[in-house]
Amino acid sequence: MSYKLKLILLFLFLAGLFSCTHSEPQIKLQSGDLLFREKSSENISKAIDKVTQTFGATHFSHVGLVEVTDTGIVVLHANPEGGSCIVSLNEFLHPKGDSVTVIAYRLKEDWQKTIPAAIQKAHQMMGKPYNFSYILSDTAHYCSEFVYLAFADDSVFKLEPMTFKDPATGNFPATWVEYYQKMGIEIPEGKPGCNPNGLAASNKLERLGIIK
């Protein structure tokens, strides 16, 4: 074997070794895990992310609840297209055929016992329309409201006063002004609510990593 060939083989071996030791391990999802989608290119997605930043500096605009069934992994969530519904994991990871970054979080051990009841509550909310006003409601739900309510009986997550103001300017972005003008209601500034970035910042959760 020539010296040059030996160098090539050594390089390939070291490259493979480095890749194996530094790649993120495959995540095995469990029922009760939360999947957070990073913001998309849609205006509302960007607007949600912009006004809901936390100290964790996450950029999430959607969240869903994992359930592992006998036939596969599904995600229970509320979205504008289908309201409160159940979709396959693949459909959640590739909305409208696109690929988005999805980060998995898991409840810490002390809170794992709340999951069965939360899954049951989530199923009871199936079929309700999407809550486009983002004002808490019993008849319609937005994504983080859906997750909050699923765990509400065990007080896993908490509500915070909502803000729709740009933290850099203190003013309402044009996107939100136009959004609520079309709905014919005032911007619900200060009303209790929740958002994906706020849920992800909970000290009851631990980050698992990116779903491949």
Task: Go through each PLM region and give its residues.
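Bacterial Sec-dependent N-terminal signal peptides
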Residues: 1-27
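Cysteine-nucleophile amide-bond enzymes
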Residues: 20-212
